[in-house]
């Protein structure tokens, strides 16, 4: 029986097979090499935002996952009070510098979409690191999707949004007008673990 020939598509920007896409130019996903200290912080933050959004097509082939990722990035940059969320979990008042945490987060996402086979003959530690980043991002987006569904399907959706996305009351106690359900407990546990991971590796996921 003849084997099925592998599919390979060559474009100006990439080499595409049935399993992988090899990008010829990566520069648009990375921050420029010149000194960012000469640029005001708001402009630098916008530069990071654009690079996170550019990674969207590489996150998944599934439209739902890509849409969840886009919503997540927009929320992180435009709505979330990360310092409040961090304080509720760690008790730390002092803020971390924003730009270094964005850089670490960008590196994390780039690793998650970069594939290297895990074999002894190839750089195993790098491959394993990329795999772990990919698994964490997959879990993060799964929980983000569940949060959105949880908020949208409840009659008290706006109240849930305030609780989960603005005030983060699910991280501190169950003394609110909403029943502290098992689903809220899942969000509590995941968000606490995510914040603690950020503290460990310097990200802002």
UniProtKB/Swiss-Prot annotation:
TM stretches of this protein: none
Domain of life (superkingdom): Eukaryota
GO biological process, one term: ascospore formation
Alphabetically ordered keywords of this record: Sporulation
Main function: Involved in sporulation and maintenance of the mitochondrial DNA. Is probably involved in a pathway contributing to genomic integrity.
Family: Belongs to the IRC19 family.
Protein name: Increased recombination centers protein 19
Organism, scientific name: Vanderwaltozyma polyspora (strain ATCC 22028 / DSM 70294 / BCRC 21397 / CBS 2163 / NBRC 10782 / NRRL Y-8283 / UCD 57-17)
């Amino acid at each position: 029986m003849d084997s099925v020939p592998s599919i390979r598509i060559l474009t100006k920007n990439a080499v595409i097979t049935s399993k992988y896409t090899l990008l010829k130019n990566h520069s648009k996903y990375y921050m420029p090499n010149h000194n960012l200290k000469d640029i005001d912080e708001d402009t630098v933050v916008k530069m990071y935002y654009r690079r996170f959004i550019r990674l969207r097509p590489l996150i998944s082939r599934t439209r739902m996952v890509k849409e969840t990722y886009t919503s997540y990035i927009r929320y992180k940059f435009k709505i979330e009070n990360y310092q409040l969320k961090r304080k509720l979990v760690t008790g730390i008042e002092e803020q971390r510098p924003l730009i270094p945490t964005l850089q670490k987060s960008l590196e994390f996402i780039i690793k998650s979409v970069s594939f290297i086979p895990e074999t002894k003959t190839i750089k195993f530690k790098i491959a394993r690191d990329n795999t772990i980043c990919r698994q964490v991002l997959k879990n993060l987006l799964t929980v983000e999707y569940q949060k959105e569904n949880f908020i949208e399907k409840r009659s008290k959706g706006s109240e849930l949004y305030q609780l989960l996305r603005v005030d983060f009351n699910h991280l501190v106690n169950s003394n609110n007008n909403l029943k502290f359900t098992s689903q809220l407990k899942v969000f509590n546990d995941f968000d606490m673990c995510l914040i603690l991971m950020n503290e460990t590796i310097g990200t802002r996921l």
